[in-house]
Amino acid sequence: MKLVFYGAGNMAQAIFTGIINSSNLDANDIYLTNKSNEQALKAFAEKLGVNYSYDDATLLKDADYVFLGTKPHDFDALATRIKPHITKDNCFISIMAGIPIDYIKQQLECQNPVARIMPNTNAQVGHSVTGISFSNNFDPKSKDEINDLVKAFGSVIEVSEDHLHQVTAITGSGPAFLYHVFEQYVKAGTKLGLEKEQVEESIRNLIIGTSKMIERSDLSMAQLRKNITSKGGTTQAGLDTLSQYDLVSIFEDCLNAAVDRSIELSNVEDQ
């Protein structure tokens, strides 16, 4: 299986590092390329023990899966450059935010299978939650192979392309939303009189420990919460205060804003 990665930004690096480290692929069958920074590309390719090239004919020849990881505003130029070299065997996997499958096919001037994936930055530690959507001309074998590739850097949820907007909001942007909540928790904890460094370290470990509890337990998060909430205790007092605020509406507004922006970005013809 030959893989080609167009684009070597942070997300692309997280993805193909996960794939390389977690698969049985031969490093000689993996090719990287970027827009222009050959020095950085060469160093990274050598670090991973894979190939790099700027020759599109070489890259696309016999390539099974071609990852499109360029910045969205660079895609049209990339498509113009590579479309003369596309073969019938190339399946495309886009990690570009906001660019629909139909537009990708239109710019590439081909009807090759195209999948869109929406990972998050947790791919860097092998724990992305990645939404994936396939064009309707994928065969089952190719879909299974792509799912296996994506599972190399986390878990997968397959949805219709229209629902990638919701996945983008919930899991794609999710880490940033949670970081923001944790920031506020640190600020509030610091106001209780502890040193900021103490609070930050405590909450960092609190997050790690709580995540492991969720991971290792078969119980729902609601039940896990109930298990540590004693009637009349300190936890109950804090939860009673939280319940006075409409947290659901706050998060609904947050997610809806992200969904709306994702839809706006997908209207590439209007940009």
Curated annotation (Swiss-Prot):
Which family does the similarity line name?
Belongs to the pyrroline-5-carboxylate reductase family.
Q: Does the keyword Transport apply?
A: no
Q: In which pathway does it act?
A: Amino-acid biosynthesis; L-proline biosynthesis; L-proline from L-glutamate 5-semialdehyde: step 1/1
Please provide, alphabetically and separated by semicolons, the GO molecular function terms listed in this UniProt record.
pyrroline-5-carboxylate reductase activity
Q: What is its EC number?
A: 1.5.1.2
Kind of enzyme, top EC level?
oxidoreductase
* Biological processes, Gene Ontology terms: L-proline biosynthetic process
First-listed, main subcellular location of the protein, grouped into a coarse class: cytoplasm
- Reaction catalysis annotation: L-proline + NADP(+) = (S)-1-pyrroline-5-carboxylate + NADPH + 2 H(+); L-proline + NAD(+) = (S)-1-pyrroline-5-carboxylate + NADH + 2 H(+)
Q: State the HAMAP family in the record.
A: P5C_reductase
Keyword annotations of the record: Amino-acid biosynthesis, Cytoplasm, NADP, Oxidoreductase, Proline biosynthesis
Localisation per UniProt entry: Cytoplasm
Mark the transmembrane ranges: none
NCBIfam families in UniProt:
proC (TIGR00112)
What is this protein called in UniProt?
Pyrroline-5-carboxylate reductase
